[in-house]
């Protein structure tokens, strides 16, 4: 494959955009390549600036559950744009999407729309502190909750990709309010809660850790967190930005039967447009301005294009058989990739929950960030490059999840597995 036009665009971009990209992982530094510049996408296919075509398992980092450029979603966006792109005033679209979100998540009696997952988690943390009158939060090593200062501590994902334990520019006074524990280590959480319970406002976590690959909760972990929070009047914030509407219509909370006091959403609910949301019980949400004293605002919050795309997407994934299809196709892909690794004699551990997956270059299992970091990132980088050259677009980091969409066919998956056989033998 030729990548000459993408390389030319990258050189232009580096002159006017820091690092040539607007989000660090897109730079492909962790895999020793230069980034692709995408021209268009349809279904599960990306087409880059050189005309190369790829089967896509990034899905814009998760939102594209129905595939790229779905006609119903595009139609909804175009119809909304024809009426106006932004008003700075309420619309009925905001109510409609909020009603659908609250119906999907019974513990979300009220929801506030924002423009990104970072805004959602940042605002939920502020609300938790305002409601409890406490300052500290507890998060988990390898869980990423956006790039707000207090959450860039042992944050996984892009931070792990570049080997940076925490970002410069985060004041020590901010970081000292953030406690961290190993994911799936309930004993360590109990010890931290016992020591800091008088100052602890919230525990925040990804219910399936998708920013260290794909790490599900061990049996009893979520239930134990829920019990600790109830016992000590700490708010449990479940960050479903990645898992919401992805692993089931009601997210990981429906899948595992554990509910948060506050929930953060994003990705799928915007249908590929910038959106986030956070919500919870009425007695908590009433503390938000204008009813309460906890301030949160946004110029483009509830943007009509994003609301329309979200409404159209949720309608599509409510159709009968959607999640059964996602499960069947994802299981078929996972088994094929496992067989390809075994045939090539390459140590690999494929972990999957629903249509989220990660192929770790190690024997596994992976239950924590420490486990994830034991992966052979050099082998992954070679595999990534081979798969790209064979027409398969994976996330350019060992520490990111991959995603299957409704647009992936059995034929697409067969081609992917064939590419994996060739790629794994080559590395």
UniProtKB/Swiss-Prot annotation:
Places the protein is found: Cytoplasm
Q: Which Gene3D superfamilies match?
A: Aspartate Aminotransferase, domain 1, Type I PLP-dependent aspartate aminotransferase-like (Major domain)
- GO terms for cellular component: cytoplasm
Names of the cofactor(s): pyridoxal 5'-phosphate
NCBIfam families, per database record: hemL, PRK00062.1
What do we know about how this protein assembles, alone or with others? Answer: Homodimer.
Query: What is the official name of this protein in its record?
Result: Glutamate-1-semialdehyde 2,1-aminomutase
Organism of provenance? Syntrophotalea carbinolica (strain DSM 2380 / NBRC 103641 / GraBd1)
